[in-house]
């Protein structure tokens, strides 16, 4: 099976997250929050997974002691190449993965911040990928 372009795949994850909130989120405009925590959690997991697709494509992280890399491994790899991206990845981890994905923070401002960070990370990563991987 041919490996999909990481930028397109990350965008697909972002679209899935948007669709999850749009279709199931039951947004309350008076409270400026989504009604169901489980859909915010799903959207957060979609967003963060999309970012991991990009990070894995740009910064293949190998660990000797653990079977899977953790956020510190990604931050260390990103820090060597781009400090702005490091700040976005740190904020994205806190917003998409922790606040949305685990805590299920239902505030629209938090969810909007997660989508904004995802878009910024994709934008920077698209400039870093070789032309054959970036349409």
Task: Identify the function of each model-found stretch.
Residues 39-62:
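Hydrophobic alpha-helical packing segments in soluble, helical-rich domains
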Residues 1-37, 127, 135:
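Charged alpha-helical initiation segments
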Residues 55, 59-135:
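Long, charged low-complexity segments
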């Amino acid at each position: 099976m041919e490996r999909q372009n990481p930028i397109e795949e990350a965008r697909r994850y972002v679209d899935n997250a948007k669709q999850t909130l749009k279709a199931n989120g039951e947004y309350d405009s008076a409270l400026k929050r989504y009604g169901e925590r489980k859909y915010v959690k799903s959207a957060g997991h979609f967003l963060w997974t999309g970012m991991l697709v990009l990070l894995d494509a740009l910064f293949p992280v190998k660990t000797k002691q653990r079977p899977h890399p953790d956020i510190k491994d990604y931050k260390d790899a990103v820090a060597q190449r781009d400090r702005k991206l490091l700040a976005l990845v740190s904020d994205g981890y806190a917003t998409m993965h922790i606040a949305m994905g685990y805590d299920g923070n239902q505030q629209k401002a938090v969810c909007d911040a997660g989508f904004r960070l995802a878009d910024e990370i994709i934008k920077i990563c698209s400039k870093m990928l070789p032309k054959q991987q970036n349409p």
